[in-house]
Regions:
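Structural motif
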Residues: 1-2, 21-24, 48-49, 72-76, ...
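Flexible hinge/capping segments at coil-to-helix
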Residues: 30-43, 47-69, 156
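Secondary-structure junction motif
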Residues: 66-90, 155
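Beta-alpha-beta core module
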Residues: 30-36, 40-41, 104-153
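Short beta-strand-to-loop elements that line the ligand-binding cleft
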Residues: 1-3, 91-103
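Extended ligand-binding regions for polar small-molecule ligands
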Residues: 62-66, 142-168
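Central regulatory/effector-binding core of bacterial HTH transcription factors
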Residues: 1-27
Length: 168
């Protein structure tokens, strides 16, 4: 839940040391945390395994015409805001509905209403009845390990070890 996420981020170094997730600089500043960036994950979509586009290996933006696209509300991060701005200005044939947060309720709604959810990642899925499909665009979002801006010695050593592995 959003409340759980806020609680975790507010207590780095006290109740929890690290968590993985997507972020932008404004998010880190607002939440008072830091991040070790591991990758730029593609921004893609998730849709029902029964959706008319589910058989495609990659979608074009024009494939979304006439569809309802679920997108995290404006202000969550600059990367999804850029997508929203492009869809609104260049592709009015796509209906956008806001979602507050990516959670089980949103994934269930995506599947049951046969919508398309703008999602993040390199494969797999978080819902058994949804399929993640890439979109032919260049949008990505930083993914990494979120932590306290002043991590403990143990956490610092862990972050350094992970950084070495990812820099190879």
């Amino acid at each position: 839940t959003p409340e759980n996420a806020r609680e975790i981020l507010a207590n780095f170094g006290t109740n929890i040391d690290i968590v993985s997730g997507w972020f932008d600089e404004a998010f880190l500043d607002y939440r008072g945390c830091a991040a070790l960036k591991l990758a730029n994950d593609p921004i893609c979509c998730s849709l029902s395994i029964n959706h008319r586009l589910a058989f495609r290996e990659k979608l074009k933006i024009t494939d979304l015409y006439g569809e309802t696209v679920m997108l995290i509300k404006r202000g969550w991060n600059k990367y999804t805001d850029a997508i929203r701005d492009e869809l609104w200005s260049e592709h009015p044939q796509i209906k956008i509905i806001d979602v507050p947060f990516l959670n089980a309720e949103v994934f269930n709604k995506c599947e049951s209403e046969n919508n398309i959810l703008i999602d993040f990642g390199n494969g797999g899925t978080v819902h058994p009845l949804l399929k993640r499909v890439p979109i032919d665009w260049d949008y990505t979002i930083p993914f990494g390990i979120l932590h306290s801006p002043k991590p403990s010695e143990t956490v610092s050593e862990f972050l350094e070890a992970v950084s070495k592995v990812y820099s190879k």
